Amino acid sequence: MAYNASLFDVNRILKSQQLIEDGIQLESSLLQICINVIFSFTVLLIFCIIRPKYPVIYESKRTLCKSETQRPDALGKGWFSWIKPTFNIKDDTLIQYSRLDAFTFIYFVRMLKRLIIIMTIGSMAILLPVNIVTALNTGDWPPASILGFITTPSFYTSDQSDKSKIWYWCPTIAIWLYSILIVGHMIMASKSFLRLRKKYHTMLTKDSHRIEDAVSRTLLLYVNEPSKTTIERDKIKCLVHQFSNTPSQRIATGSYNQHLTYLVQKYTSIVNKLEKSLVAYLSKAKKDQNDDGAAEELDTFKRPIIKLGWWHQIKVDAIDYYTDQALTLSQSIKRNRNQLQNADHLFAIYADTYSAHQAYVSLLNKTTEQHALIQKVALAPHPKDIIWKNMTLDHDTRKLKRLFGHGLFLSSIFLASFPIAIVASLSNLINILRFFHKTRRTIANNRVILGVIQSYFTPWFMFFLFLISISLLRYITQQQGYRTKSMLEQKTLIRVFAFFVIDYLFIFTVFGVLIGILGQMTIMARLLHRERTTMLSRYVFQMGKNIIGICIHWINYICINCVGLAFQLLRPLALIKDKQDVSDFDFTKNYAMVLSIFVATLFSSAIVPIILPFALFYFGFATMVFKYELMYVYTVKVDTYGKTWPVLYCIILCSVIAFQLMMILVLSLKGALFQVYSLIPLPLLTCFPLVLHGKYLYRKIHPLQLELNNDDNDSTEPKETNNPTPNDDRSARWIEKIYRDPVIRRPLIKPCIPEEYRLLIPQVYKHHRQHQLILKELFQMKSRKKSSRTNTINTTRKSKEEESERVYYVDPIDSYYDGPSSSSNSTEPSAPDLEMILAESPLPAYVSPKEQTL
């Protein structure tokens, strides 16, 4: 009788504490939902009002993008005229204006939205009613609060019978169905994506086909030591010819200078600052006087001043200072371009794709067995995708950087557990207060404040912490020496996912549950005069109930992310800075945010199914926002042709496995052993499609050229290369040009001064001792259509010194340059795209692999 009485007291105390927690949690959650709804609608209304007034910011892709193929049609001037065009954007239109990577992102978000729709319908129609019926027939009735009707772990008390455990089969079946649904949907979506990707390649222009054909004909080879002499270079070339089935047309040795990267970055920054100072100075003079007057009395206007030194005590003329810096850096860059060293990589160019792939297979087998000089053979990545500053890293340095990066990543996971523990404590602030004596009245008198801290400020803190974590993990990954941007982004995304699962789901849940159970057991031990350890060991079942609070926290997190989407649409930082340029869409960050919402929803779907409607609203809103941004605001400079899809597939299936393991843990805490046994095979079964279909996707997508070769060129034969034509040699020389480091071959940018101010430039520098040199080096008064760089490309080679100083038309998208400054209208063109090379140095007419066989 004493035991029953004690057990009755325990249940009564737990129920009273749960009633207080659920009441505060429900009130605060409703309050934060109302605040976020009002906040989001206010931000959206502000966006609708100011959008027509600032087309440079909210339609920057249309107003500032130089590429005709990526410039969309103009939107209307009405407040809500952006909604219908964005909603009606078709996939073909999105691919045309934003390339395949943008479509891949929208396709992935839409796929997750479809999954959430199916899960929401099933949960609202089956799982939620079953939870209510189960709570009515077993456990505490009436429930402590409305949360007891809709959550799974609130079914039962500690004295539940084996007969009542039959109700656990409902969430168990839901776990099986969710797993089958997600895995099957991912496989079908992957097959559809491969078909769309193949269709996209057929939609490419002829110039794009030529570029892809040129890239597919090139192999990238790494040697153990850079060749320092002509004899060593010839030896490597002979080895490549010997081990290949067909001789290569050309072999280009990589070259570099260790100082050029820093010099070019510094030069670009100085030129942008010089441009801003000049435009501000000349526009002020132009505003007060006409053209003639301004030219005559330009010296009367105050020139811009900057402060230098540790304490900013030295004042100098900003225009003269930046000009001298730019001139010095320009001359230093020219000198360093004449002092190049051979790198440990080279590019072998073949006559056609078939010959290149046959040589790749042959070199891959023979070099590892017969000769150790050639260290690695790979298909050459696209020039836009290469991180050139990492191409010159030797094998030992790259290996050391990889190990150091792995150590930093593991350290970041450990260090991030401390702020995550603080977040978990703030989300359980009531139980933290229960550790202290006489806090019951404090909790009762400050319900609103405690609820707002738990349900509103804590999710915001987690949201900003996650954004900081993404930037930190990207920085760590950048230090590991990956050679391509696509690989860098994929590795960053994988690490962000692992970081989120370990810290934000596992550690946050463990800390939250432990703090909750310790706080409740502290009150119980104090009231029943027992040891807290005895209470904790006997009433472990209460941990299952405390998981509900963690799941409710993710509902608040989803609402905060909806507000974040509204601010992402408003772009307040760009509005404040008056930033007038076309930014690149941050795929890694947005993928990470979308995946965090989906994974958190999946983890809570079987416990708190009410989270699914909130996730459905988020994905619907996210689809709208991201479509608008990709269509009208951001550009996609580097198109990897959907290489991220295999990584996304593996991440989703890994999240399914983690969800299954967590539910096994929750059910084991509730004592549902038969249900746990039925779930044990599920993670093992999920591993099969993860491994098998993941490898299939990787073979299909990495690289694009292999897929096209296997599908279309099974019967093709290599072209005769014994007597190469002039067009073939010209094409090989062009490929060699685009596979040179941009800091070596790219023209230096010039200050972009509006045409009405350019006549005043000589007056600005008439007092300078290097007046003529400045006008010649930094301000080329030539038209935009006929640049001196065009004549440079078309001229013949004269000498080795001229060749080293020559600058070529190359693709402007690389990691060294920020692009042309946007503080004024551009009159000095930046280096053109690869398509512009084709227009000025035309390659032979493109012939498809199928036509080559005819």
Predicted segments, located by residue:
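Transmembrane transport/permeation module of multi-pass membrane proteins
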Residues: A2-R789, R797-K800, Y808-I813, D818-S830, ...
